[in-house]
């Protein structure tokens, strides 16, 4: 490098720019006042000015210009949000690189410019307009590189096909995303880090959107090898498998043990590489550095696993032996608070620190929401909370508010309908909203007579079509709890004596739902000695559903009086295990009383009568 005047050399100015930046990073976690903010951004501006001085006052080689520009642009994008100026510098550098490409192999630098223009800048701008422009330019670049028929550019084309997929995800072009992922994966070498990385992205996308995951993607996920992808990506693989199992309401014990073994041998590597990014080798001359979310740092990952365990066991919160959610949720909350308190800069920007704090706050909000949900399961009513925010989006709070109105005797149909139609609402919140809305509407049909009945029936059918559509389009269809809930509600609303005015249906629908009930009943029958017909229909948790399945099965499928009596007795007794089920217990108690009477069990009749009278007193005293 040439000298910059008589005072400082170019290398000195360059190192000065780095010192200003690094010093700003070192004080980022200590900022607690406006003065501190001014100091931080003052240092960042000085760093940018030093880089600009190098570009405007010095004669830099192409590679030197690239190095300076890339470092300066990172600050412009991440610290000042001056995207237009960043784009100007990148475009100018790209033109210079293309002019000199005949003299030097500068493909990597040119591709980095393209990546910044087509990936980093559009994602930071985060607007549909910029995503569309970037996607069009990205497609043109890919086509250009493919037409060159050069192996090096063919490999770079796959990188920008990946960029195109990321842009399509942002534009919610879901059909195109799935097709593009399939095409990309089919082009990759088997058992390569690049292919397994793409598959991790694909499965992660499908889970995020709650789309069903194809078997070939699941098989690719299972085949991912630690020694090829490295500990960071393998931790991602394990986390995805855990979430998939949670979404299916499956047993997570094996996955927890796998994580334990993984931590035993890879803890140090995870800790050492925190914040350094993960380098994906595509070909010998091509690599892509990706930044994994903070939750894949060792301490954060262990905390997230505890949160996932809490969610997995939350429907068992009534069980004194298996109430892990009541033990783990407070622990996750306190651990997260400690992580916020002890957060350290570690050479990262203030924006990165803010991002980490927001992640921690999201975890705290999840904990708050699930604590309320847990109490709802235990008490059969939505409890009030002083927390200003529950869950990661307003939909969670609105759902609880609507449920509270419903529990207190109101309809809440309008709010449930709005929630189900909201664009940013999760699949679970939509499904709960639709099912609760259907329950309210079906209850109105049951009580209604006369002219309004036809209108209410039509409203019920419209809601049910949405329920079936959501179930078919998402991975909720693979969770037996959801399928069982849908089956039970349909049967309650279409058969006497559960409804005074059963909803009309076709013979095909009736046969389909009765067949599903038979499967769930065979797999979850309380009476000992019954073989499980199909593990897909086994309810591992969810006591209320188990009771209702046995209640419906006993009433609709059983014919032996002794069998019916045994089932009703067991259902009546099981209701006592979970709070908030007194009304369900009362209905089942009436059924059991009928069975005792028909079976001429005088002692049981008297005992059941006494229990029902005590139950009525408990229910009426709560109302008063």
Swiss-Prot record:
The keyword Repeat does not apply. Transmembrane segments: none annotated. One of its GO terms (cellular component) is SMC loading complex. Changing residue 298 to A: In scc4m7; eliminates centromeric localization of SCC2 in mitotic cells and reduces association of the cohesin subunit SCC1 with the centromere and pericentromere. It is found in: Nucleus. The keyword Nucleus applies. It comes from the Eukaryota. Keywords: Cell cycle, Cell division, Chromosome partition, Mitosis, Nucleus. GO terms for biological process: cell division; double-strand break repair; establishment of mitotic sister chromatid cohesion; establishment of protein localization to chromatin; mitotic chromosome condensation; mitotic sister chromatid cohesion; rDNA chromatin condensation. Changing residue 324 to A: In scc4m35; eliminates centromeric localization of SCC2 in mitotic cells and reduces association of the cohesin subunit SCC1 with the centromere and pericentromere. Its main location: nucleus. Changing residue 327 to D: In scc4m7; eliminates centromeric localization of SCC2 in mitotic cells and reduces association of the cohesin subunit SCC1 with the centromere and pericentromere. PROSITE patterns: AMP_BINDING (PS00455). One of its GO terms (molecular function) is kinetochore binding. Present with 907 molecules/cell in log phase SD medium. Belongs to the SCC4/mau-2 family. Interacts with SCC2 to form the cohesin loading complex. Involved in sister chromatid cohesion. Forms a complex with SCC2, which is required for the association of the cohesin complex with chromosomes. Binds to the nucleosome-free promoter regions of ribosomal protein genes and tRNA genes. This is MAU2 chromatid cohesion factor homolog.
């Amino acid at each position: 490098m040439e000298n910059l005047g008589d005072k400082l050399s170019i290398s000195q100015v360059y190192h000065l720019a780095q010192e200003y930046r690094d010093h700003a990073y070192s004080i980022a976690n200590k900022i607690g006042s406006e003065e501190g903010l001014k100091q931080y951004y003052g240092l960042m501006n000085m760093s940018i000015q030093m880089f600009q001085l190098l570009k405007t006052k010095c004669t830099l080689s192409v590679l030197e210009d690239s190095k300076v520009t890339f470092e300066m642009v990172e600050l412009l994008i991440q610290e000042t949000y001056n995207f237009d100026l960043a784009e100007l510098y990148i475009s100018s550098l790209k033109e210079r690189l293309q002019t000199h490409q005949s003299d030097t192999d500068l493909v990597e630098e040119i591709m980095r410019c393209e990546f910044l223009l087509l990936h980093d800048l559009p994602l930071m701008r985060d607007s549909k307009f910029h995503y569309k422009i970037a996607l069009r330019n990205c497609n043109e670049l890919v086509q250009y590189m493919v037409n060159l028929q050069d192996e090096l550019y063919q490999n770079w084309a796959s990188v920008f096909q990946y960029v195109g997929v990321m842009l399509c995800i942002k534009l919610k072009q879901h059909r195109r995303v799935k097709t593009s992922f399939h095409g990309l994966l089919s082009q990759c070498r088997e058992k390569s880090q690049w292919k397994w990385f793409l598959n991790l992205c694909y499965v992660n996308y499908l889970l995020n959107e709650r789309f069903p995951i194809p078997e070939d993607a699941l098989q690719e996920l299972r085949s991912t090898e630690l020694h090829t992808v490295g500990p960071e990506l393998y931790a991602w693989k394990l986390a995805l498998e855990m979430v998939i199992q949670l979404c299916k309401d499956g047993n997570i014990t094996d996955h927890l043990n796998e994580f334990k073994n993984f931590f035993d041998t890879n803890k140090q590597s995870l800790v050492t590489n925190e914040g350094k990014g993960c380098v994906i080798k595509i070909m010998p001359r091509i690599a892509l550095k990706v930044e994994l979310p903070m939750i894949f740092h060792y301490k954060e990952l262990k905390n997230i696993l505890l949160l996932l365990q809490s969610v997995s066991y939350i429907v068992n919160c009534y069980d004194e032996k298996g109430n892990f959610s009541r033990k783990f949720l407070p622990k996750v909350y306190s651990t997260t608070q400690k992580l916020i308190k002890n957060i350290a800069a570690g050479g990262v920007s203030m924006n990165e620190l803010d991002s980490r704090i927001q992640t921690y706050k999201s975890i705290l909000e999840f904990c708050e929401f699930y604590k309320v949900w847990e109490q709802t399961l235990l008490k059969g009513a939505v409890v009030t909370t002083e927390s200003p925010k529950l869950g990661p989006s307003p939909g969670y709070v609105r759902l609880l508010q609507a449920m509270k109105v419903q529990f207190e005797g109101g309809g809440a149909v309008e709010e449930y309908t709005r929630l189900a139609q909201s664009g940013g609402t999760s699949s679970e919140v939509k499904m709960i909203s639709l099912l609760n809305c259907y329950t309210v509407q079906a209850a109105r049909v049951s009580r209604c007579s006369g002219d309004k009945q036809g209108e209410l029936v039509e409203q019920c059918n419209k809601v049910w079509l949405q329920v079936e559509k959501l179930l078919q389009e998402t991975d909720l269809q693979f969770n037996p709890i959801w399928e069982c809930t849908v089956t039970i509600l349909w049967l309650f609303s279409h058969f006497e004596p559960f409804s005074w005015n059963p909803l009309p249906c076709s013979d095909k629908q009736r046969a389909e739902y009765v067949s599903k009930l038979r499967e769930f009943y065979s797999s979850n029958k309380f009476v000992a000695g019954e073989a499980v017909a199909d593990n897909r229909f086994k309810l591992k948790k969810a006591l209320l559903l188990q009771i209702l399945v046995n209640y419906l099965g006993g009433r609709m499928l059983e014919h032996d009086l002794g069998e019916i009596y045994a089932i009703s007795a067991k259902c009546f007794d099981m209701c006592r295990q979970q709070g908030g089920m007194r009304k369900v217990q009362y209905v089942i108690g009436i059924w059991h009383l009928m069975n005792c009477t028909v079976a001429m069990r005088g002692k049981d009749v008297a005992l059941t009568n006494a229990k029902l009278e005590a139950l009525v007193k408990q229910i009426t005293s709560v109302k008063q």
